[in-house]
Amino acid sequence: MRNKRPASFLALFLLLVASIAAQQPAAAPTYKFEEVMIPMRDGARLQTVILTPVDPKGALPILFHRTPYGVPKRPFEQIPPEIKELAQDGYIFVVQNLRGRFKSEGQFQLSFRVDLNDPKATNEATDAYDSIEWLVKNVPNNNARVGMLGVSYAGLTTAICLLHPHPALKAISEQASPANEWMNDDEHHFGALRESYVVEYAVMEQADKNRNTHFEFETYDTYQWYLDLGSLSNVNAKYLHGSIPHWNSTVQHPDYDEFWKKEAWVNQLHSSTVPNLNVAGFWDQEDPWGPWEIFRNAAISDPERTNFIVAGPWFHGQWYGGKGTALG
């Protein structure tokens, strides 16, 4: 005779799910908005927004997000759908502009270099470390436990913390993160320059520190614009005029030389230093290489089994803005 207990448990589970679904959704929590300038080890201060529940139920963990694209300018009018469930669990949300972006001081390098041997160096890993140190000491009602979460560039600024994590960093989820810009992330596909990506992206991040600048094409058909452009040197000769540092560096280093090897921060990763959930898309047009390299390198030493990856048939970051249950 078959055991009927699994069927009974399944029936009870389905009844429970139906009961929960029938309940009214919980009211969105109200958040206190605070903007601060957090000092780094070299004196530069980074623009940071702290969103704290007005009526917290005890000390809360901090969920930290570092981005080059801008921080919230006002309190949530409604909770963004991508963090709705996290908000219901109870977090202090912290969003920070990277060094040199918007009100953050210093120079934005659009660089992934990390020099673990130079105690005076500043980079995305040290800026995250210094920020977490400040947050756990200065944000009221936090429980000294920090998590980090991000997709794409914010996935990178999350993943790079694996190299030198702050003791208060307890878990991360790096998603669609680049790891090697020459091999097969963002700017190159195994050394072949993605011209139609790098030009626009470098302009967006480095033309004006106070906004995300969109390159103004002269034609609607971007593909045709690049066909008509001619030589790669015409990008600077006709349009950028040497004003975008990252574009200059990219075209000055067409081969996999020391410049790109130093940018490949993942080559310094040899262990899973923080419990981490990596997310990758099989159809990621931007970063098909990074998530797997991060996962592979973190697995070199993972005695506590804290290194995980989830992958699906998604384009770049598709799962973050929706359910991720369909393509297109």
Please state what every model-predicted region is.
Residues 24-58:
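N-terminal cap/lid segment of alpha/beta-hydrolase-fold proteins
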Residues 54-137, 321-327:
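Cap/lid segment of the alpha/beta-hydrolase catalytic domain
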Residues 289-307:
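Active-site-adjacent alpha-helix of alpha/beta-hydrolase-fold enzymes
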Residues 8-19:
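Bacterial N-terminal signal peptides
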Residues 79, 88, 110, 118-128, ...:
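Accessory cap/linker subdomain of secreted extracellular hydrolases
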Residues 150-160:
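Glycine-rich nucleophile elbow surrounding the catalytic serine of serine-hydrolase chemistry
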Residues 272, 278-280:
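Short beta-strand/loop motif that positions the catalytic acidic residue
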